[in-house]
Regions:
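Short helix-coil-helix linker/hinge
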Residues: 9-14, 71-72
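Short capping segments at the starts of secondary-structure elements
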Residues: 13, 25-28
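Base-recognition residues in the alpha-helical recognition helix of bacterial helix-turn-helix
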Residues: 20, 44-48, 63
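A short acidic, leucine-rich amphipathic alpha-helix
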Residues: 32-33
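Beta-hairpin "wing" of winged helix-turn-helix
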Residues: 51-61, 68
């Protein structure tokens, strides 16, 4: 995963909203999908894009998959922005 992939994943408003939701803690794909008027496949696509970009991680518990923010990648992105101030 690269910063380029992470920034590209952030370009979509739905994915931005998903990340904002995850700031409150981990959520299941079903709980995330309940906030949007789109198919489960579309929500899965957005979650997969965020996962491939390293912005979220998935945790399997039994038959459920939960998603949470990957703070290490977010911190890396913030560090990149802070370097621009120098």
């Amino acid at each position: 995963m690269s910063l380029k992939e992470s920034f590209k994943a952030l370009s979509d408003p739905t994915r931005q909203e998903i990340l904002q939701m995850l700031t409150k803690g981990r959520m299941s794909a079903g709980d995330i999908g309940a906030h949007f008027d789109m198919t489960g496949a579309t929500v899965s696509h957005h979650l997969n894009t965020l996962k491939q970009a390293g912005l979220v991680e998935d945790i399997r518990e039994g038959k459920y998959i939960y998603y949470e923010l990957n703070m290490s990648v977010i911190e890396e992105m913030m560090g990149w922005f802070l370097q621009l101030r120098k």
